[in-house]
């Protein structure tokens, strides 16, 4: 699914200056507005400026080595940073901070897309702060939330 059927998303997307994109992006709004679609389009553009069909297939199947999509009903600390004895059945020990610490593999950039960010507690958000405050070169973090007020001010103002 793409933003082509949603005029309001196309309008937002076409006004994004990808040459001046900040490394941290928060997309916030009510459920059902298309935030996930917009976030996926932005991530795709960051990773694949030429829109190569092979890269698009990797992104769409969540198998792109430079794309990390965190889509959990509740985001826990071990999803953001490594904690001993915590195992993620879906991705092994892979977490956002570890992913962002490695240089890009096949793209010029890396993107971590965090969905349902409103479910992160303060400890999770603080663990993410270091990656936002001191981003590695060519890394982008896209945070999607239904409730902007659930995010720490320190996270929002970076």
Report residues per predicted region.
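A short beta-strand-to-loop transition that corresponds to the Sensor-1 phosphate-sensing loop
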Residues: 116, 143-148
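Conserved small/polar residues in nucleotide/adenosyl-binding loops
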Residues: 156-158
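Clamp-loader machinery-focused feature within the broader ASCE/P-loop NTPase space
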Residues: 1-123
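Residues immediately C-terminal
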Residues: 119-120, 134, 150
């Amino acid at each position: 699914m793409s933003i082509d059927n949603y005029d309001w998303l196309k309008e937002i997307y076409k006004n994004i200056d990808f040459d001046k994109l900040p490394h941290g992006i928060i997309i916030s709004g009510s459920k059902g507005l298309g935030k996930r679609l917009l976030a996926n389009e932005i991530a795709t553009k960051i990773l694949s400026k030429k829109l190569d069909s092979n890269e698009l297939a990797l992104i769409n199947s969540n198998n792109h080595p430079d794309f990390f999509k965190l889509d959990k009903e509740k985001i826990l600390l071990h999803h953001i940073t490594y904690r001993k004895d915590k195992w993620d059945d879906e991705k092994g020990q892979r977490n956002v901070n570890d992913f962002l610490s490695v240089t890009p593999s096949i793209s010029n950039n890396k993107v971590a897309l965090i969905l349902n960010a409103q479910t992160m507690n303060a400890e999770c958000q603080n663990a993410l702060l270091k990656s936002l405050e001191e981003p590695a070169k060519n890394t982008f973090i896209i945070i999607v939330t239904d409730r902007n007020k659930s995010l720490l001010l320190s996270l929002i103002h970076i």
